[in-house]
Amino acid sequence: MLTLFFSLISLPYAPNALEPVISQETIEYHYGKHLQTYVDNLNKLVAGTEYESMPLEQIVAKSQGAIFNNAGQILNHNLYFMQFSPVAANNHLPQGAILEAINRDFGSFEAFKAEFEQKGTTLFGSGWVWLSADKDGRLIISQETNANNPVTKGLKPLLTMDVWEHAYYIDYRNRRAAHLQALWQIINWDEINRRYAE
């Protein structure tokens, strides 16, 4: 019997709670099938290795090849899915420390959003666009291809948007930019502030 070192995270919302921004069907495929496959693969790959007892962040920082790809995708998706809350929630605008940092480093929230969306729209192929903080708390927007994550560069990931086609094709078809613009409606800025403060 396979030992489970990693398991699928529990979502803090119902599968239909992010509609109409992200449909229940997309959640069922993206979370229930894609992410579950990465978890299953990683459990098989790390069995009997030094990685089986490491936290995901360490595996991503130290591994290569298939272990890195699957661990990276789990870490990326965990951060992605846990940053959302239903459209009806009242926490979808940044405030506090993260808003101060956004204004300091990008000039305004609108300027930050424009740069973030531009980086997400222009990333060639599959990957992620990230807002991260460096060791001094400065904010950085980066494009990361495939399973890459800013932790490999010594940064603290705060917010991400998935630009792999499986993240948006059911709901938006080839309209990646529309998908990115819509996601702001479900970002839980309380969670982003918590990550920034860690």
Regions found by a protein language model. Give the residues of each.
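Feature for soluble, non-membrane regions of globular proteins
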Residues: 2-198
